[in-house]
Amino acid sequence: MADFIRTQIFGTCFEITSRYVDLNPVGMGAFGLVCSAKDQLTDQNVAIKKIMKPFGTPVLSKRTYRELKLLKHLRHENLICLSDIFISPLEDIYFVTELLGTDLHRLLMTRPLEKQFIQYFLYQILRGLKYVHSAGVVHRDLKPSNILVNENCDLKICDFGLARIQDTQMTGYVSTRYYRAPEIMLTWQKYDVEVDIWSTGCIFAEMLEGKPLFPGKDHVHQFSIITELLGSPPEDVIHTICSENTLRFVRTLPRRERIPLASKFRNADPEAIDLMEKMLVFDPKKRITAAEALAHPYLAPYHDPSDEPVAEERFDWSFNDADLPVDTWKVMMYSEILDFHNVDIDVNGQPPQGQFEQVHAQAQAAVAQNEAARAREQEQQQQEQQ
């Protein structure tokens, strides 16, 4: 059994295995505190994220389970990679990933970026998104602080705590306001992978300008300043608004014409302007995809169709509609952690014994119960439609 060491970080107890030393706080991620550390096993620097109260409520448990499953499934050069995971004696969950030196937010705070760096960073973001979207996943919270960069300018997208299934029925208030797509504000219900493209367009503009493109003070101001630059949304987009209150608000705004982005970004390359215009489109159906953006002339110096992979299989979202108690989510997480560490058999080829065996069996039973409930629900819906 692993030895655990307790350390206080920002008044928070970090309880980690003795494998990791030299803890230093890095910052807060989505729903967790992040520290840098030294992995004595590999002699590499790593980031350790403590998930706050993973078993506090069913919602928090499900969110943690979702992030764990995503980190296990999504394996790509431009996505943060999970190297270890463990549950402490206090039942806190810790994700261990590679450590990158900084993030895009901090980089933009220090100095303007030169063209070749903007191109390379944008290329890597889109390369990662092409893979993520092909797996049937929407990140939902892309922003400069969720984009990590090392000294070689290698870039990795992190914080999949809010990521969701590609779906036409999603709940609304998720991404950081400055980078939030208009369809999230307009409909609060229906959106898909295109929200990540909008966020990327905002990040692209921020790399060019050195400051946020749409720094809204609140929800209303955010949408208003978007229309000041991009003009009023077209009628076919307005007709998709589900909320009566939102529809009334949009109708009260003065009619505005689109301002050419070239007049705002006077020093930008025309090809950069063209790509940004294809990203920052009100109608998500007309927004450029990640794969299409990679093939845009602006990214020609880096574009290589043979080295821009898609996911081998789509992510399994079968758990996503499950309404399960904390204890069930807990045993399912234990099972995922055992699977990550390949704790299926012992050194003699025998099934796991004791607690591991019990947890594994409980998790399998919980999953089977959930799948059976979903099957009954689908059967009932089919009968009602007949």
From Swiss-Prot:
ATP binds at V26, G27, M28, G29, A30, F31, G32, L33, V34, K49. Residues 20-299 form the Protein kinase domain. Pfam families: Pkinase. Its EC number is 2.7.11.24. The active site is at D141. It is an enzyme of class 2 (transferase). Its cofactor is Mg(2+). Keywords: Activator, ATP-binding, Cytoplasm, Kinase, Nucleotide-binding, Nucleus, Phosphoprotein, Serine/threonine-protein kinase, Transcription, Transcription regulation, Transferase. GO terms for cellular component: chromatin; cytoplasm; mitochondrial intermembrane space; nucleus. One of its GO terms (biological process) is positive regulation of transcription by RNA polymerase II. The keyword RNA-binding does not apply. Dually phosphorylated on Thr-171 and Tyr-173, which activates the enzyme. GO terms for molecular function: ATP binding; MAP kinase activity; protein serine kinase activity; protein serine/threonine kinase activity; RNA polymerase II CTD heptapeptide repeat kinase activity. It catalyses: L-seryl-[protein] + ATP = O-phospho-L-seryl-[protein] + ADP + H(+); L-threonyl-[protein] + ATP = O-phospho-L-threonyl-[protein] + ADP + H(+). It is found in: Cytoplasm; Nucleus. The keyword Transcription applies. Residues 355-372 have a biased composition (Low complexity). Residues 349-386 are annotated as: Disordered. A motif (TXY) lies at residues 171-173. Disulfide bonds: none annotated. Activated by tyrosine and threonine phosphorylation. The modification Phosphothreonine is found at T171. Belongs to the protein kinase superfamily. Ser/Thr protein kinase family. MAP kinase subfamily. HOG1 sub-subfamily. Proline-directed serine/threonine-protein kinase involved in a signal transduction pathway that is activated by changes in the osmolarity of the extracellular environment. Controls osmotic regulation of transcription of target genes. The TXY motif contains the threonine and tyrosine residues whose phosphorylation activates the MAP kinases. This is Mitogen-activated protein kinase HOG1.
